[in-house]
């Protein structure tokens, strides 16, 4: 079986292909690339869907490139947006680019290790040197405007630019479309052309909302190199149960950077996902063998309440993105916060506690101190009435809101509801606070 055929079979079986431009097993794919604009300091879960085909090509021995669009980010990609992006300061864009570069570097090594754990059917064992991370500023910084227009402009038709979905949608919207946004597709097309000429890249991957930008690139390469065989592959978009795209623009991003979304929160995101989304993601976002995926889903169907699919999905994504140690920590934290049996301080355990088997408070603090939901109560606020304390700790937006939730019985400390808005948090204590569906660890030690 050819490398390309093996790779395409994986992508098709995992529902990772939304559309392609005549990409067949008989095609000659040399190198593959995926772009990422540094509009935030981290990639997010939505980016994983487009990243996974690149991973499969990498694991099948193809040279792959991730292109950080630090130059094109100055214009703003209009795809999938109803309004223009806000202009980003150069220092922020540079910091984001550095952060994503380091994240991709860590991901490439973590993914290779994870694939080996999954007994991935490598067509050819890849080398880390086959995954290159580049920035498109490296080829734009010395490119003059007239040179760009004279080399690209003659090969592009304005009618085609205006016909692309990302453009027509915005032209019909109240906010309209800026000239900078209109020309974004030209620069992404030039990225493809540059990579084709300098690195023999002839396949670009992206989300389905990138189809217009990607095919602008294949069109440009074919016009400037009539004998070129270049291809495009897009993936489905990951959407919420309401059909909303999961991305930072929608305000619901789950970040891949553990400093922004800790491993416990990433784990819990998938544990709490709707069944249909979890089953899709199990195929798309893990490297488990295809036969095992079917077995897991069949087992899940016998008793969906056990969330077997969700547990495999959460464990595999955290293992792949954050590593083994992070997964172990997330699983311990999950048992302490969501186990079957009540334990001291509002925590839980997998089995009834016996003797001194439950962790000490310093041990629990060490487990949770880096989590976003961990709150320290220092001497300056420890005597505040409970409703004010919850506002100070940013658990509620106002003291009035906190009081309303306390009086309604929606707030519990330990395993007991707190019904007094003037309650004082005890000194030298560490408790689990549950505020509606949210969980926090409060520490006054």
Swiss-Prot record:
Subcellular location: Mitochondrion matrix
Record GO biological process: mitochondrial translation; tRNA aminoacylation; tyrosyl-tRNA aminoacylation
Binding site for L-tyrosine: 33, 77, 184, 188, 191, 210
Keyword Transit peptide on entry: yes
Segments carrying motif 'KMSKS' region: 245-249
Keyword terms of this UniProt record: Aminoacyl-tRNA synthetase, ATP-binding, Ligase, Mitochondrion, Nucleotide-binding, Protein biosynthesis, RNA-binding, Transit peptide
Protein's UniProt keywords contain Calcium: no
Record motif 'HIGH' region, residues: 38-47
Major localisation: mitochondrion
Binding positions (ATP): 37, 248
Gene Ontology cellular component annotations, sorted alphabetically: cytosol; mitochondrial matrix; mitochondrion
Molecular function, one GO term: tyrosine-tRNA ligase activity
Record SUPFAM superfamilies: Alpha-L RNA-binding motif, Nucleotidylyl transferase
Limits of the S4 RNA-binding domain: 384-445
Organism superkingdom: Eukaryota
InterPro entries per record: aa-tRNA-synth_I_CS, aa-tRNA-synth_Ic, Rossmann-like_a/b/a_fold, S4_RNA-bd_sf, Tyr-tRNA-ligase, Tyr-tRNA-ligase_bac-type
Family designation: Belongs to the class-I aminoacyl-tRNA synthetase family.
Oligomer status and interactors: Homodimer.
Reported function: Catalyzes the attachment of tyrosine to tRNA(Tyr) in a two-step reaction: tyrosine is first activated by ATP to form Tyr-AMP and then transferred to the acceptor end of tRNA(Tyr).
Protein name, entry field: Tyrosine--tRNA ligase, mitochondrial
Protein source organism: Schizosaccharomyces pombe (strain 972 / ATCC 24843)
Gene that encodes it: msy1
């Amino acid at each position: 079986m050819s490398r390309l055929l093996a790779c395409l079979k994986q992508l098709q079986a995992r529902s990772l292909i939304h559309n392609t431009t005549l990409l067949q097993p008989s095609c000659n794919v040399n190198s593959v690339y995926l772009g990422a604009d540094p509009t935030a300091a981290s990639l997010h879960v939505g980016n994983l869907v487009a990243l996974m085909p690149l991973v499969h090509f990498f694991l099948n021995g193809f040279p792959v490139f991730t292109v950080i669009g630090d130059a094109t980010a100055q214009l703003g990609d209009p795809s999938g947006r109803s309004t223009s992006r806000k202009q980003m300061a150069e220092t922020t864009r540079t910091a984001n680019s550095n952060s994503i570069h380091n994240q991709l570097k860590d991901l490439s090594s973590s993914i290779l290790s994870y694939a080996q754990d999954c007994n991935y059917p490598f067509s050819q064992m890849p080398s880390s040197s086959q995954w290159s991370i580049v920035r498109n500023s490296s080829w734009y910084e010395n490119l003059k405007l007239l040179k760009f227009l004279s080399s690209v402009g003659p090969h592009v038709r304005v009618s085609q630019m205006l016909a692309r979905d990302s453009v027509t949608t915005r032209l019909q919207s109240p906010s309209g479309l800026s000239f900078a946004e209109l020309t974004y597709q030209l620069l992404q097309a030039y990225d493809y052309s540059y990579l084709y000429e300098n690195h023999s890249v002839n396949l670009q991957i992206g989300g389905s909302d990138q189809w217009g930008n990607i095919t602008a690139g294949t069109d440009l390469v074919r016009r400037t190199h009539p004998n070129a065989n270049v291809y495009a592959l897009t993936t489905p978009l990951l959407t919420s149960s309401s059909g909303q795209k999961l991305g930072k623009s929608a305000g619901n991003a789950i970040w891949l950077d553990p400093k922004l979304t800790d491993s416990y929160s990433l784990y819990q995101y998938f544990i709490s996902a709707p069944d249909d989304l979890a089953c899709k993601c199990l195929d798309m976002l893990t490297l488990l063998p295809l036969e095992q995926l079917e077995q897991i889903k069949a087992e899940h169907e016998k008793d969906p309440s056990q969330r077997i699919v969700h547990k495999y999905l959460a464990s595999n994504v955290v293992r792949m993105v954050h590593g083994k140690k992070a997964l172990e920590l997330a699983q311990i934290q999950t048992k302490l916060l969501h186990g079957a049996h009540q334990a001291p301080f509002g925590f839980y355990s997998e089995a009834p506690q016996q003797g001194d088997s439950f962790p000490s408070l310093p041990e629990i603090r060490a487990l949770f101190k880096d989590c976003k939901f961990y709150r320290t109560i220092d001497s300056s606020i420890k005597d505040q009435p409970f409703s004010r304390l919850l506002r100070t700790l940013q658990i509620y937006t106002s003291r009035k809101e906190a009081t309303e939730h306390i009086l309604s019985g929606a707030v519990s400390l330990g395993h007991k509801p707190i019904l007094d808005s003037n309650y004082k948090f005890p000194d030298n204590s560490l408790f689990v606070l549950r505020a509606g569906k949210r969980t926090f660890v409060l520490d006054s030690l």
